[in-house]
């Protein structure tokens, strides 16, 4: 079925006509109906876009936010199925935001122009009781301060429009770029008009969109946002950078911190490093966030990160570097003292991850890292370095005040000093209190106050100084006794000295308590003997429950710690602050050991409990298995007994049923037999009631006895009936024969007629077929000669073609066979030649060895003969002179000559060239053996015998 026709130009024309007659609401409604109609799904989005643009323009002008929202949702629902439709949705929403921003700007310009025209002389904007009361009854609220309602309504409309656009664009991979653009424009709207509440809702909305996108990563769906894509992740990261920047500009520090956490998590996911300028701006915002939070360590670390990135800026000047370096160093000096160890939970531990710091660094570590970093410390101004020297390196409480007041005016002249003056003042005052506690045992209040009273912005009242002193005592940096009557402060040198006196008092109190307990026990025993076993006596002797107080436990532990620390010789020689540090470290170590012991004990208890539970479970499982077996056995026995009873009952019922069925069959047969006998009409009738208790044979016998009376008469009747039936049958057949013959003649005549008709039809059909075939034959016979000629020519051409192909294939086959035969012959010849050469070499080697053996044998014989001859001469002429070895030398010479001749002969044979390959069969060589493939049988046999002989 074809889609319904769509005429966008008609809808536009209709809307223009309604607008021309000042019926804009009706025009808006007509466009709304057209956009939300289902038939637009069959049209291309480019056809519908002009209608939507016109609708949005008119809707924004009339401020119909709900109608626009519904229309946009319906439009997206109808066209989002295709990529072109999603592109159209993005274009429509961008146009919508353009219309809204243009309209808001025009309305704001109108409001400003109107406010300029209505200038009042009243400095308070014309807000007086009189015109305030009169404005209630007037339609035009022109009083200054009350004429912004229209503009506020347009701002609310703009905010709702931004929300609608973001909701339509969220979590769609095809609309990511448009979504990012609308997010940026929404932030600019909140910044421009200082809409803090709307900005909070925007931040929450963006966070929900990101959570939803992350949640849908593992689910299947079309156009899902892929957070593993680098471009997508970068867009989300850029949005969070803008969110941090806008939050800081609006002063929404909580939102800025949340956005910074989002930036941290997104940067962990991405592999693409953001731009240095973007990161520098981000860390600059973190500097302000941590400054407001009051955490100076985080503030200083953020400054360092910012300086590292800002140092890569080619446009930065040395003056800016010096200012930033001085600010960083001053912020580090403003970090509150953290000389004492503590185990409090750090609520800012999550914030350190934002700066890629695993654990919280100490104040000393932060300052030392800046001092060691030459790129920062070398650019710090002289006054700040001097402050570092007098505060950290060479602190002297007596001379500090003069040195500090000398550089204070220059420091106050710097623009960055105001942010750190309060925290720096607290650090300096805390150090002065610690110095005073170490140097003096007691000091007058006036002297103490004057030592920490500075000029200008560092000046505090006595009340504030006393608060600082109390706070230092709370933080355990000093311990003192304040005497306002004598106007002096007495510093305590040992933080645990009071617990020694407490311990002595506690020992006395414990002895008194023990004596009181013994007296109470005696009184209780006497009361028990007097009252016997009565209930009142039992209540009287009931032991009171002990009350354990936490303060008592703490005092006891501290007194034990004090006794332990007194054994350390260094404890008595150090200052109060060092004693507190030592005590805290000892307490922390003891607590850690206690916790470790508790953990081990709890783990051991858990293991024991687990083991007991396992054993209990195993025993329970075994018992349960035994119980289950017994229960199963009992159930089987009960089931077997029940089945036996049921089987017995079923057998009994079956027997009864068979008996009933047999009785019913018997009675039915008796009734049937009685009916049959009575139906024969032999003159004898038997009643059912007479024979119902009899058996079948008895009934038959009974009936036969009843019939025996008329037996003779019955036999006579039967014989007569048989004879009568025989004559009747013969009469029937005699009459029937002529009729049957007549019927057969009629059937024969009918068959002959049908046969003639059928034969005629077959003959006619055969003749017609023959004539048709003869006609075809005569028609084809005229062209038969041509057909035969064409056939012969085609057969000849075909045979000639196939003969050529066959001859070619035969030639190829023959050539291949010859090549293969030649290859096999050559291979066999080479194998035979190699084998013959090897055998020949072996024979020559054997011959050479035999000759060498023979020469050696002859040499041995000659040597033996010479030895025998020499021995004989020695025996016959013992005193004759020794004969020269001339004969032996001659023999050796001859032997060497023979060996050299044999070696030359063998070398000549081995150096002879190998025989050439066998020549063609047409020219065989007479002196060389024929190739293996061309030898005769006799030649092959002769060669074989030669090889066997050589072996």
From Swiss-Prot:
It is found in: Cytoplasm. GO terms for cellular component: cytoplasmic stress granule; eukaryotic 43S preinitiation complex; eukaryotic 48S preinitiation complex; eukaryotic translation initiation factor 3 complex, eIF3e; eukaryotic translation initiation factor 3 complex, eIF3m; incipient cellular bud site; multi-eIF complex. Residues 97-125, 496-532, 592-676, 704-779, 808-909 form a coiled coil. GO terms for molecular function: mRNA binding; translation initiation factor activity. Residues 505-538 have a biased composition (Acidic residues). Residues 503-544, 863-951 are annotated as: Disordered. It comes from the Eukaryota. InterPro entries: EIF3A, eIF3a_PCI_TPR-like, PCI_dom. Belongs to the eIF-3 subunit A family. RNA-binding component of the eukaryotic translation initiation factor 3 (eIF-3) complex, which is involved in protein synthesis of a specialized repertoire of mRNAs and, together with other initiation factors, stimulates binding of mRNA and methionyl-tRNAi to the 40S ribosome. The eIF-3 complex specifically targets and initiates translation of a subset of mRNAs involved in cell proliferation. PANTHER family: EUKARYOTIC TRANSLATION INITIATION FACTOR 3 SUBUNIT A, EUKARYOTIC TRANSLATION INITIATION FACTOR 3, THETA SUBUNIT. Component of the eukaryotic translation initiation factor 3 (eIF-3) complex. This is Eukaryotic translation initiation factor 3 subunit A. It comes from Candida glabrata (strain ATCC 2001 / BCRC 20586 / JCM 3761 / NBRC 0622 / NRRL Y-65 / CBS 138) (Yeast).
């Amino acid at each position: 079925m074809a889609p319904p026709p769509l005429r966008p130009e008609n809808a536009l024309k209709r809307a223009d006509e309604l607008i021309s007659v000042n019926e804009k609401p009706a025009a808006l409604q007509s466009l709304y109906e057209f956009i939300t109609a289902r038939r637009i799904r069959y049209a291309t989005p480019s056809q519908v876009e002009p209608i939507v643009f016109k609708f949005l323009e008119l809707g924004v002008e009339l401020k119909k936010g709900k109608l626009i929202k519904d229309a946009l949702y319906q439009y997206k629902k109808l066209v989002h199925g295709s990529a072109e439709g999603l592109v159209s949705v993005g274009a429509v929403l961008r146009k919508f935001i353009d219309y809204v921003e243009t309209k808001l700007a025009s309305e704001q310009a109108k409001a400003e122009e109107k406010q300029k025209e209505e200038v009042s002389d009243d400095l308070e904007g014309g807000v007086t009781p009189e015109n305030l009361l009169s404005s209630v009854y007037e339609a035009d609220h022109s009083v200054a301060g009350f004429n912004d309602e229209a503009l506020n309504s347009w701002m609310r409309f703009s905010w709702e429009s931004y929300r609608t656009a973001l909701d339509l664009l969220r979590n769609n991979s095809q609309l990511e770029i448009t979504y990012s653009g609308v997010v940026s424009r929404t932030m600019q709207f909140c910044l421009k008009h200082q809409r803090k509440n709307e900005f909070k809702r925007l931040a929450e909305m963006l966070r929900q969109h990101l959570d939803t996108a992350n949640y849908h990563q593992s689910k299947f769906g079309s156009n899902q946002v892929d957070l593993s894509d680098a471009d997508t992740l970068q867009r989300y990261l850029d949005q969070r950078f803008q969110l941090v920047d806008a939050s800081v500009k609006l002063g929404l520090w909580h939102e800025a911190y949340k956005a910074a956490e989002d930036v941290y998590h997104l940067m962990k996911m991405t592999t693409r490093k953001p731009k240095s300028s973007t990161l520098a701006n981000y860390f600059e915002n973190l500097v302000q966030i941590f400054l407001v939070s009051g955490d100076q360590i985080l503030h200083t670390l953020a400054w360092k990160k910012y300086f590292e990135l800002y140092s890569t800026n080619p446009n930065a000047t040395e003056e800016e570097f010096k200012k930033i370096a001085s600010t960083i160093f001053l912020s580090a000096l403003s970090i509150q003292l953290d000389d004492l160890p503590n185990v409090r939970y750090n609520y800012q531990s999550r914030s350190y991850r934002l700066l890629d710091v695993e654990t919280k660094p100490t104040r000393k570590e932060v300052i030392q890292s800046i001092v060691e970093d030459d790129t920062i410390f070398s650019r710090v101004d002289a006054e700040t370095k001097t402050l570092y020297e007098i505060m950290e390196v060479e602190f002297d409480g007596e001379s500090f005040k003069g040195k500090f007041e000398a550089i204070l005016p220059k420091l106050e002249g710097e623009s960055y000093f105001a942010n750190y003056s309060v925290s720096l003042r607290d650090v300096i005052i805390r150090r002065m209190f610690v110095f005073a506690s170490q140097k003096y045992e007691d000091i007058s209040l006036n002297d103490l106050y004057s030592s920490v009273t500075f000029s200008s912005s560092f000046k505090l009242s006595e009340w504030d100084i006393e608060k600082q002193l109390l706070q230092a005592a709370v933080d355990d940096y000093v311990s003192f006794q304040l005497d306002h009557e004598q106007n002096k402060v007495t510093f305590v040198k040992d933080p645990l000295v009071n617990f020694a006196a407490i311990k002595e008092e506690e020992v006395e109190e414990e002895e008194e308590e023990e004596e009181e307990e013994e007296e109470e026990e005696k009184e209780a025993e006497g009361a028990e003997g007097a009252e016997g076993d009565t209930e009142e006596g039992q209540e009287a002797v009931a032991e009171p429950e002990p009350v354990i107080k936490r303060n008592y436990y703490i005092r006891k532990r501290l007194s034990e710690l004090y006794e332990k620390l007194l054994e350390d010789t260094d404890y008595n020689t150090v200052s109060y602050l060092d004693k507190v540090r030592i005590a805290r470290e000892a307490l922390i170590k003891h607590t850690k050991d206690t916790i470790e012991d508790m953990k081990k004990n709890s783990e051991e208890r858990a293991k024991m409990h687990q083991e007991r539970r396992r054993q209990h479970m195993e025993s329970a499982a075994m018992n349960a298995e035994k119980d289950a077996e017994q229960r199963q056995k009992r159930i089987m026995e009960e089931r077997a007994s029940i089945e036996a009873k049921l089987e017995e009952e079923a057998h009994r019922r079956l027997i009864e049923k068979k008996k009933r069925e047999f009785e019913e069959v018997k009675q039915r047969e008796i009734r049937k037999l009685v009916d049959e006998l009575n139906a024969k009409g032999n003159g004898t009738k038997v009643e059912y009631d007479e024979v119902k208790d009899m058996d079948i044979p008895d009934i038959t016998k009974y009936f036969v006895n009843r019939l025996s009376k008329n037996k003779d008469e019955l036999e006579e009747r039967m014989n007569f009936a048989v004879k009568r039936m025989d004559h009747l049958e013969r009469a029937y057949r005699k009459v029937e024969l002529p009729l049957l013959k007549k019927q057969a003649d009629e059937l024969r005549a009918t068959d002959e007629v049908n046969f003639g008709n059928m034969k005629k039809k077959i003959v006619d059909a055969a003749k017609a077929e023959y004539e048709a075939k003869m006609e075809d034959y005569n028609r084809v016979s005229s062209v038969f000669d041509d057909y035969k000629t064409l056939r012969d020519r085609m057969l000849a051409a075909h045979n000639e073609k196939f003969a050529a192909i066959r001859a070619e294939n035969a030639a190829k086959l023959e050539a291949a066979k010859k090549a293969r035969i030649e290859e096999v012959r050559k291979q066999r010849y080479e194998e035979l030649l190699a084998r013959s050469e090897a055998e020949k070499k072996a024979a020559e080697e054997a011959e050479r060895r035999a000759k060498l053996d023979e020469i050696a044998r002859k040499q041995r014989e000659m040597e033996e003969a010479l030895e025998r001859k020499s021995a004989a001469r020695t025996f016959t002429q013992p005193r004759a002179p020794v004969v020269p070895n001339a004969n032996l030398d001659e023999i050796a010479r001859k032997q060497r000559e023979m060996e050299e001749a044999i070696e030359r002969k063998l070398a000549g044979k081995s150096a002879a060239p190998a025989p050439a390959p066998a020549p063609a069969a047409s020219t065989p060589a007479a002196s060389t053996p024929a190739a293996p493939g061309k030898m005769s049988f006799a030649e092959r046999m002769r060669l074989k015998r030669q090889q066997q002989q050589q072996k």
